Amino acid sequence: MFKRHGGELLVLLSHPGGPFWKNRDVGAWTIPKGELEIDEEPAAAARREFEDEMGFSPGKLLSPLGEITQKGGKRVIAFAVEGEFDVASLRSNTFEMEWPPRSGRKKTFPEVDQAQWMTIAQARAKILPSQIELLQRLVDLTS
């Protein structure tokens, strides 16, 4: 999701929840994303994942930003939508994992623990390095 504020392009990024990401900032932020369901169209998956992770449906026509491959080999098909989102209203889905490791105890964590509007320069500094290309594609799309 992106918006313009005072003539400047802002992008909405999310920070992953859970203990692995707790104290990480630079290189940890990401676009809201997730897995395709069987026979699901990429744009439908993008809407569903945005709603799951942010608690809000973007609802508008999505503009394709193309595909990238992340460091671990995960393929990401990205879309952009212009809109408004109050980061204080973030309501992410959750996941469960054993924590601490080998403790036998399960703990529930939000998939996304925070969201933030950032300038493109701020986003370039904080986003997963493999997703920087998506920021440039957004700039190209909106100029």
Protein language model regions, located:
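Short, charged/polar surface micro-motifs in flexible loops or helix N-caps
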Residues: 6-7, 18-21, 37-38, 72-73, ...
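Short connector loops at helix/strand junctions that flank enzyme active sites
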Residues: 26, 31, 59, 73-76
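Residues that scaffold the ATP/ADP-binding catalytic core of kinase and kinase-like folds
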Residues: 23, 39, 126
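The catalytic Nudix box helix
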Residues: 31-65, 119
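Charged phosphate-binding loop/patch that engages nucleotide di/tri-phosphates or the phosphate backbone
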Residues: 116, 120-143
